[in-house]
Amino acid sequence: MQGFDQKFRDLPDYILKITYQIWEDKDVESIREYYAKGIPVRSPAGVVYGPDAVVKATYATLEEFPDRQLLGEDVIWIGNEHDGYLSSHRILTRATHLNDGVYGKATGKNLIYRVIADCACKDNQVYDEWLVRDQGAIVRQLNFC
């Protein structure tokens, strides 16, 4: 893939490897390498801009769920080297609510839920992302409803 690091075979390999590096390897600072300056990351909670905001949110999530795993189930994609690529990454997430945070006081409960991350990528960077997390599954497993 022109413009991407040689270690990536294709776009699914890129998406899966950077996700693993950020979350399983806990290399949160690598977001600054892989996310473009000014990137919008959209979710039902709102929009954040730039790698600094993504790094901050990632650290906050890892503080609340330090054992969080993002198990990539599938990446569908389209695109080319000239125009860039679009991906949709289906993820199964496992985590334990070990510390206080956005979901309240730590419960110690084990969670399993799904996430969809849709990314636009070019030249070894994600430059636009839509992120949807199954909040309903999370709150049900935490007994909030």
Please identify what each model-predicted range represents.
Residues 1-145:
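C-terminal and inter-domain tail/linker signature
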